[in-house]
Amino acid sequence: MKKYKTYQIVVIIIGLFLCFFGRFIPVSPKSMILRSAFTSRRYSGLSASGAQTLFIMVGGLLMWLLVGVDWTSLAVILALALIPELGMNKVAAGTLGNSTVFYLLLCFMLAKSLQATGVAHRLAVWFLTGSFSRKGAWCTIAMIFVSIFVLSSGLSSSSTIMIFLPILYEIFESLGYEKGKGDIFPAVMIASLAIICQIAQATTPISHAMTLIGFSSYNSYTGNNLEFGQYVMVAMPVGILTAIGWFLVCRYVWRPDVSRLSRLDYDAIKGNEGPFSKQEKIAATIYLIVVVLWLAPGISKYLCPPAYPLLNKIHQCYPPIVAIILLHFIKVDGKPVLPYKEAISAVPFSTLLFMGALLELGTALANGDIGVSTWLGDTIGVFCTGVSPFMFIVVLAAMSVILTNFMSNSVTCAICMAIAMPLSTSLYSGLISPVIAAIMITIGINFAFATAPATPPVAIAADSGWISAGRLFKYGAVAGLVGIAVMLAVGLPIANMVC
């Protein structure tokens, strides 16, 4: 049984009380919340169910942030089901029955094919040991960054970091570095592994739970879909330029001593890998076809408008379903390329349940009958009067990046969306497109680089023994500033063109 610290027990008690009994808390009229929730009458525009939804959000975020995302997700789901306007049937359909949750499940299963067949590891080694990488120390570092970026854009950042950690450890040891010595080069590389992973995670929704939460939160508030291709056209340039910016910071600001890389044995890293196996070719080909089908609808809207109506009928779940079935039935040497049981074993169901709970919470906040969205727009709008649309986007972008470095991506997304969506459809209606605000937030919440609580890859880097917490925070903070600058200088203009 998991043992909780004293503060966590206190948080659990407070969180559960807010989730289930928050509506009975008498609140001063000055706070614009219900004095009593024994009745369903409105007070200052907020219903009893609206007040309860806000308390569920506060209680849920507290438990998710300080306790964990396991059983707490079930508690939030139950609390939401007790709201009269929702009920268990709607809540169940909105959590595990959510198409975005199902899509993420399929992504994890499909991504397993790249890991199980060895494609992911081979790709990483190929980048690292190629002819360009051998031209010099900074060429090697550049190719390491490129390989991390490429893999993490299609795999979860946690999977990518687990592929590269053994490779980096092998490099450090072969060059004579030791843990705890405070050498800058290993520290820069370990920090960069987490940073590039997170940057790439922001570029596509493929196997990226937090990016998909941004997609679904936008849908919950507006009823519209954020297109795959539309998002990638904005996020990919931002990600690439942010990664390049970080590389330049590493080379010209941190300036680690890279002289030892001249002794790196590339052939030893490459090992005895033979040519591409038939399984690898099949898995890689099918995966690439799926990615093309995901991108086709959004891109065709701009490059080939006549084809858009047809391609737009391809739901994002269709390609991976077909791919997973094919990989199960296509056999090489009498064995499936990816057996179904092996594919399903790659699915982190606790993550899916957490994601479903968070999405349903967003749906409840946006529910017109409950009225929280309207109330938030009116309440927060008072503080935004006189703030220009551009400055509002600047604040959103900065807030999403800053908050996500001190709390989980999902909590940051919930907070930022709860502020941005109501205001972009009320105070800034016609001035700020909700989809642009959603894209900026979704990119920003992935730029979690500075602290261990921010995201699992950063926690792994912090616990590696190759970098101190202080240095990781400094590197992550600078990377965050680079990300904000690129989001506003490049991402925002592109978003205004394609959205």
Where are these regions (language model features)?
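Alpha-helical transmembrane segments of multi-pass membrane proteins
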Residues: 104, 137-150, 177-200, 226-234, ...
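Membrane-embedded alpha-helical segments and adjacent helix-loop junctions characteristic
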Residues: 42, 72-78, 82-179, 344-345, ...
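Transmembrane alpha-helical segments and their short flanking loops
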Residues: 209-231, 261-265, 456-478, 490-499
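Transmembrane alpha-helix interface/packing and boundary motifs in multi-pass membrane proteins
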Residues: 60-69, 147-157, 195-205, 329, ...
